Amino acid sequence: MPSHSLLVGYHGCDRSLVESVVAGKDDLKPSQNAWDWLGHGIYFWEDSCARALRWAEAEPQRRASRIKTPAVLSAVIQLGNCLNLTETEPLALVKDAHEAYLQFCAASGSPVLENRGTALQVRFLDCAVIETVHQFRQEEGNQPFDTVCGFFVEGRALYPGAGFRELDHIQVCVRSSKQIIGYFLPRST
């Protein structure tokens, strides 16, 4: 799980935030939404500037948004101790965390959260399970995960019967901002 791999991530946001972060006046804030599918942290699209811009352009239409002028911030990210959900061993951790989450809900009388939306884009259950993984690591004294990576299936099928979708992508959630080596502006967006 520890990785010295570097990747380029792209974060869709407002141009004013891009300029402020690149100038060293501000930092990206971790998302703490209950539906963040990879848990809480700073989200990036891996190697997809165009996808980050597309998200930033669509975001103001979805809800009250701070994005007035869509833009993209690029970052060099070192994965560090990564919960990589494209690998078998980390997926087993997540499966175990789901079982523990269900047991907690049963014991406490709490409702089990569900993923919602036509494409399951509101991921309450996934967020709760990923946060359970992090909680267990902390309770057991294990090294925390710095980042979480996952493959997100999104959009319409590329062609009839396709397993590929128009908006499929790899997303990275940075939990420890020290893994962000630096920010830069993409050449064009």
Predicted segments, located by residue:
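Short, solvent-exposed secondary-structure capping/transition elements
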Residues: 52-55, 64-65, 84-87
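Extended catalytic/binding region for NAD+/ADP-ribose chemistry, centered on the ART fold
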Residues: 33-59
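Cytochrome P450 catalytic domain signature, combining two hallmark sequence patches
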Residues: 59-72
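Active-site and NAD+-binding cores of ADP-ribose-processing enzymes
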Residues: 7, 12, 19-23, 27, ...
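Membrane topogenic helices and adjacent juxtamembrane segments
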Residues: 1-7
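Conserved nucleotide-binding/hydrolysis micro-motifs of P-loop NTPases
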Residues: 15-16, 49
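Internal mixed beta-strand/loop scaffold within catalytic domains of large alpha/beta enzymes
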Residues: 18, 27-38
